[in-house]
């Protein structure tokens, strides 16, 4: 049987007795990084007399293709990501799909998750959408962020310390009045919360992993971008035309035809 086991996102005490028992009884451990998982088990004084199989985003399909179905049925198998809940911005979903397809029994142990923890800490209320990490750069990033800002639900993102300032600057440009909640180093000693309008956010120390919670937009209100701002975005003409149509009385087709003539 397969058990998906969440691991702490920072504080080692944030793990359940059930999760520890599953790790202790495991015969096969699928994990993102075997070094990280072995270190974690050592911290909990759990013996390493198990088979460890590295399974991450780059080899997930290959590992599943070579799986011994009987092992998953007859042995105690667990999957853990490096931190948090498997399957949420981490591998795990494809392994579940394999179990569903092959009628292999599985279960999921509830536990730590950065997105939900940050949402609760934000004080925002209402429906929310989780978007994981944005594309690193280029028009794909811009397109994704603009769609998120047009969303009429609360949005939750993950961002790395290397790109958090870039994201804040983008939010200042596209939605300066939007309320943003930032959570850094959740559950750790230097846990930090910041809540302010995008235009007022100042980051003094960007080190650490970030969760960004963006208050919902108003679907009847246009993004805080003017015509020239959109023209200067690194987007395909069709996407620009759609955005420009939202702040004008022209159709996307009319604007597109105008743009291709310029």
Where are the predicted features?
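Glycine/small-residue-rich loop that forms an oxyanion/phosphate-binding "nest" at active or ligand-binding sites
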Residues: 64-117
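Structural motif
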Residues: 32, 55, 80, 107-109, ...
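Alpha-helix capping/helix-boundary segments
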Residues: 35-37, 114, 163
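Glycine-rich, flexible N-terminal cofactor/catalytic loop recognition
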Residues: 1-57
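Class I SAM-dependent methyltransferase SAM-binding "motif I" and its flanking Rossmann-like core
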Residues: 94-151
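Short active-site oxyanion
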Residues: 23-29, 103-106, 154-155
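A contiguous loop/helix-start segment that scaffolds small-molecule binding in enzyme catalytic cores
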Residues: 2, 51, 76, 154, ...
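Conserved helicase motor
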Residues: 54-61, 134-137
């Amino acid at each position: 049987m397969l058990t998906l086991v969440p691991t702490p996102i920072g504080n080692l005490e944030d793990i359940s007795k059930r999760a520890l028992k599953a790790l202790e009884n495991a015969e096969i451990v699928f994990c993102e990084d075997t070094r990280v998982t072995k270190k974690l088990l050592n911290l909990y004084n759990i013996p390493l007399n198990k088979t460890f199989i590295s399974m991450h985003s780059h080899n997930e399909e290959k590992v599943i293709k070579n799986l011994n179905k009987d092992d998953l049925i007859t042995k105690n198998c667990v999957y853990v990501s490096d931190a948090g809940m498997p399957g949420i911005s981490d591998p795990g979903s494809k392994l579940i799909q394999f179990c569903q397809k092959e009628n292999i029994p599985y279960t999921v142990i509830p536990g730590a998750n950065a997105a939900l923890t940050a949402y609760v800490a934000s004080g925002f209320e209402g429906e929310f959408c989780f978007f994981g990490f944005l594309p690193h750069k280029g028009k794909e990033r811009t397109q994704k962020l603009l769609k998120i800002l047009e969303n009429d639900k609360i949005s939750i993102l993950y961002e790395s310390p290397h790109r958090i300032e870039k994201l804040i600057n983008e939010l200042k440009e596209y939605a300066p009045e939007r309320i943003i909640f930032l959570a850094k180093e959740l559950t750790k000693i230097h846990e930090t919360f910041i809540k302010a309008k995008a235009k007022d956010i100042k980051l003094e120390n960007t080190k650490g992993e970030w969760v960004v919670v963006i208050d919902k937009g108003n679907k009847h209100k246009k993004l805080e971008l003017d015509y020239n701002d959109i023209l200067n975005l690194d987007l395909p003409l069709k996407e620009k035309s759609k955005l420009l149509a939202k702040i004008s009385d022209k159709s996307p087709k009319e604007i597109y035809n105008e743009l291709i003539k310029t």
